[in-house]
Curated annotation (Swiss-Prot), chains A, B:
InterPro entries: CASP/CASPL (IPR006459), CASP_dom (IPR006702), CASPL (IPR044173). Coiled coil: none annotated. GO terms for cellular component: Casparian strip; plasma membrane. Homodimer and heterodimers. It comes from the Eukaryota. It is a multi-pass membrane protein. Regulates membrane-cell wall junctions and localized cell wall deposition. Required for establishment of the Casparian strip membrane domain (CSD) and the subsequent formation of Casparian strips, a cell wall modification of the root endodermis that determines an apoplastic barrier between the intraorganismal apoplasm and the extraorganismal apoplasm and prevents lateral diffusion. It comes from Populus trichocarpa (Western balsam poplar). This is Casparian strip membrane protein 3. One of its GO terms (biological process) is cell-cell junction assembly.
Amino acid sequence: MSARVDIPADTSAAAKGTAPLIAASTHVKGGYKKGLAIFDLVLRLGAVVTALAAAATMGTTDQTLPFFTQFFQFQASYDDLPTFQFFVIAMAIVSGYLVLSLPFSIVAIIRPHATGPRLLLIILDTVALTLNTAAAAAAVAIVDLAQNGNSSANWLGICQQFGDFCQKASGAVVASFIAAGVLLFLIVISALALRKR
Amino acid sequence: MSARVDIPADTSAAAKGTAPLIAASTHVKGGYKKGLAIFDLVLRLGAVVTALAAAATMGTTDQTLPFFTQFFQFQASYDDLPTFQFFVIAMAIVSGYLVLSLPFSIVAIIRPHATGPRLLLIILDTVALTLNTAAAAAAVAIVDLAQNGNSSANWLGICQQFGDFCQKASGAVVASFIAAGVLLFLIVISALALRKR
């Protein structure tokens, strides 16, 4: 008799156990996608600030040396180097895109299971990442050259003379690399959110 | 009586119509994902060849000028410029990754609805794209400098002397940009394949 009582008790417990578990797991899935979407929005705001800071820092990089000859004053500005000009333009485009992408990120929070905004975000984020990385890598190549020069090509470093210029440019490059890292993370989040399960 | 006959005939036709339509659409969906996966594999093979060509071209870029002084022979090699060294290493890593990713692409063809390999591919492809773009952009900044020099920083172009060197390096950069474009396309394909529908 104890066995008879036991077996129904067990199966009913199992049945009771599974039903709430499934409900809980679907609830958790929705919450998980929503959590990813909120995380996406927060990271995106951070990326906007970082990309804007990179563009603004590089865009205001110039230095005039305090001494001058009769005919010439020594001055270095970001637009002396085409790579730094490209950097400013590219980072400005990335910042603009990130601001415009905020509404889509909010839509993804409201409707965590909609794939349309996610798909749009992942594709455009990848393009923005490419642009951002190109700007950062090209600028770092030039900053390294300005810092160390290259003896083989007979290019001398200019950071001995224009120290502040180089420091500001380096800061902008670091900011753009951080923005690229955040964008890479955003793409991973979008890919996880696009998954079927 | 004609009305009685018409109505059942219509509904049965509708019922007959819907059932095969649903079956056909699920079949088309599977085929669409399989088609994307096959396209992915073909593009990936193309990217392997392009990335390898970029690495090999840059890695064999050197030029010795046919004249020399008593003490010095003029020579330019890719490893005189750290950016070009980085380019060779980065493109070799990208090629290696692309070769290793081929089995996952084949798994995605065999099981078009599995999200695991797709998710892995999209994340690692994004990392590879970042590396590839960084190498290409940094190299293009240096190639531009070698071609045109920069009067503000007093860096003179070296392509007047080392013409073949510059041409080979430019070719490698072009190949790496093509590889980056293919990788971008692969990510879009993976994102489309990851969609729920």
